[in-house]
From Swiss-Prot:
Location relative to the cell: Mitochondrion intermembrane space
Positions bearing N-acetylglycine: G2
Function of the molecule: Electron carrier protein. The oxidized form of the cytochrome c heme group can accept an electron from the heme group of the cytochrome c1 subunit of cytochrome reductase. Cytochrome c then transfers this electron to the cytochrome oxidase complex, the final protein carrier in the mitochondrial electron-transport chain.
Native source species: Xenopus tropicalis
Family to which this protein belongs: Belongs to the cytochrome c family.
Name of the molecule in the record: Cytochrome c, testis-specific
Gene Ontology CC entries for this record: mitochondrial intermembrane space
Gene Ontology molecular functions: electron transfer activity; heme binding; metal ion binding
SUPFAM superfamilies per the UniProt record, alphabetical: Cytochrome c
Keyword Cell inner membrane found: no
Length: 105
């Protein structure tokens, strides 16, 4: 899929202001992402989601994240995630490779 090392740099630049990935990491503006893969939208315990996120009902995996990260507001209209998205597919694949590695250990 992607390159996790490159993905880590993308995460630090574009995601870490609002998200953490480590087990037991705190929620920031966005939820902690540990355990993301295989979880339904809007399910990180202790984070206040919009109804749009809670009701989307998809399960996060490589495919859903690839689509979501391109344009979050288009994928989940009503999400409070203000990030515009990552247009380059390769960058999204690198980020997903990093997330897969960092959110499951």
């Amino acid at each position: 899929m992607g390159d996790a090392e490159k993905g880590k740099k993308i995460f630090v630049q574009k995601c870490s202001q609002c998200h953490t990935v480590e087990k037991g990491g705190k929620h920031k503006t966005g939820p902690n992402l540990h355990g993301l893969f295989g979880r339904k939208t809007g399910q990180a315990e202790g984070f206040s989601y919009t109804d749009a996120n809670k009701n989307k009902g998809i399960v996060w995996d490589e495919g859903t994240l690839l689509e979501y990260l391109e344009n979050p507001k288009k994928y989940i209209p009503g999400t409070k995630m203000i990030f515009a998205g990552i247009k380059k597919k390769g960058e999204r694949q690198d980020l997903i490779a990093y997330l897969k590695q960092s959110t499951s250990s």
